[in-house]
Amino acid sequence: MALDSTPWFVGGGAQHSPEVARALAYAATTGAEGVSGIGDLKVQAQAVPNGTVRVLPGAGLLLNRYAGGTGQTYSLRNATQTDLAVTATGSGGGRTDLVVARVLDPQYEGTAPADPTTFQYSRVEIIEGVPAATKTAKELNLSYPAIALARITLPASTATVTASMITDLRRVAQPRRERAMMTVFPSSTLSMPTAGYSSWPLTTATRPAVSVPIWATKVDIVAHVTGVKFTKVSAVDTVAGIRTGFGSSLPAENSILIQDAEDSGGRYNYTWVGTHTVTEAMRGTDQVVNIQAVRSSGTGLWVADYQTSIVLDWEFSEGAQ
């Protein structure tokens, strides 16, 4: 196969092909596909549910799935909210529909538009009657570029689309990640709480406040705590609950620690692991990374002191929301 005669970008009046431009988009985005931002092209029921759904503004990247289009990417944008009519179901049964963003390219479709300046080359539309478990447009083996935005599951005899019928299928094309780590050393001897969850072996003074990226939707927290002193007091198991915290997000429990009755006292290492949703209100603010514990049964004693180290590792990530 010969090279395209004109690379991107040559001056002097050279004619540039759409294939080379799409190849540039593919290379620049490493072949990624999906929506551009966390809220882009989200499909929602109307504020007052009716027989339509709304597709919010946003942008997306679509791989060229026309025959001969390998290694090319389209970029589309929905500038304003778009409403789509959903066909009502009859009494004979329900139906599953797929809302997609797609490209219609006359170069491959074979029919030139009557007016190329007003033709709608990109559009959002509904594909009716797809398999109930459909998650991507690729599963349908379409012969054109498309990405799945949402699945609508309609019961029989339904003309009104509610939020509970819509499953969000969007994926961010190039999700961002940001990771950081720090080590904390206790400045005093700290016994594990026994009256309820509290920061341990961190304290109010040593919990780090971290800057939350404006694009983050999730944070994963891992804490490795080494050199914790355990003192065996009686011949029964000692159990503790542990959990990670992020801002005001404190789950009931992430895990437990158990020192069996057969264990001897000494220094032990433990790990906290947790995942937290980053809410819209948290983005662009400083939030505290925290780990907590409480002894829930038994009489053994866990103590952090000058021989203890706490390695905190957190990673923000981005996903459609």
List each language-model region with its residue ranges.
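Terminal beta-strand-rich extracellular "head" domains
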Residues: 222-321
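Solvent-exposed, conformationally flexible loop/turn segments
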Residues: 143-147, 157-160, 185-205, 263-269, ...
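Residue-level detector of short, conserved catalytic/binding motifs and their immediate flanks
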Residues: 97-99, 219, 287
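Surface-exposed coil/turn segments at beta-strand junctions on protein surfaces, enriched
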Residues: 79, 92-94, 214-216, 267, ...
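Glycine-rich, flexible loop motifs
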Residues: 2-93
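Terminal (often C-terminal
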Residues: 169-236, 311-321
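Surface-exposed ligand/attachment interfaces on beta-rich extracellular proteins
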Residues: 32-50, 84-93, 190-216, 230-239, ...
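Beta-strand-rich solenoidal segments
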Residues: 8, 60-188
